[in-house]
Amino acid sequence: GLRALGVPEQYGGLSIDTVTTAIIVEELGRGDPGFTNSLTNNRKVSAYLAQFAPQHLQDEWFPRYMEDPTFLMANCNTEPRGASDRALQYNAPEAGLQTRARYEDGHWILNGRKQFISNGYLAKLFVVYANTNSSVGMLDGTSTFLVPRGTPGFTVERANEKIGRRFCINGEMVFEDCRLPEDHLLVRDKAMKKRGGYGISGKIAESAQAVGVAQGAFDATASYAREHFQGGARIIQHQVVAARLANMATKLETMR
């Protein structure tokens, strides 16, 4: 189903291209952007694992994901101090990721905190961005790790209250000497640079969702204008209202 958009076909997934994903996300965005956001985050992490995870980890986790309809995944980048501070290319102590990872005795040890992570409060599998080389800038010194829920030293602390997209519950993650096997390293350094099509695809999906939300708002507005009367005529028959609706429709098509 829709949860399988980014899962490879050999695991029963759809492995759908970016354009088709955008069409699906736009339609879903008309109804509930929170549901759509949760869905696109699953798709984003699935596509990332398909591209970067070792084969044995894909063999372990994709079947679990496909068999469990409650299985959510999350992409952990945003932090309390720096937000999604991945655009800064200079190396300064106050800039970039504060979550650190060091290699020790055949394991990776993570320490830090993430917040506002979509799907985070309920997710069972996380892709975590961490600083592994403080001597270079963020684009060259960031690595990604696969962290299952329940890993010792990893805590999902709380859910954040939101005024919108409430179906997609975000959360805060804490890493306190979180110990990961060596093979749970997905991308060693330069993880930001290697996002490639995965990152672009995610942005396209978010944009398509916004178009869907706008289309839903336009549909509701046009329906109201057709059904309600003012000044002895349907609202849509007033020239200024019709002109505004036409302008909205034009902008929607331009966005699409």
Task: Label the model's feature ranges.
Residues 69-84:
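A short, Trp-centered hydrophobic/proline-enriched beta-strand micro-motif
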Residues 88-92, 116-119, 135-136, 162-169:
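Short Gly/Pro-enriched turn/cap motifs at secondary-structure boundaries
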Residues 99-102:
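A structural signal for short hydrophobic beta-strand segments in well-ordered beta-sheet cores
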Residues 2-72, 119-125, 211:
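Internal helix-loop-helix
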Residues 111-155:
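A short core secondary-structure module
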Residues 1, 8, 24, 54, ...:
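Buried hydrophobic positions in well-ordered alpha/beta secondary-structure cores of metabolic enzymes
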Residues 30, 155-254:
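Glycine-rich beta->alpha junctions and the first turn(s) of the following alpha-helix
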Residues 82-84, 93, 97, 108:
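Hydrophobic, small-residue-rich alpha-helical packing segments that form membrane-like cores
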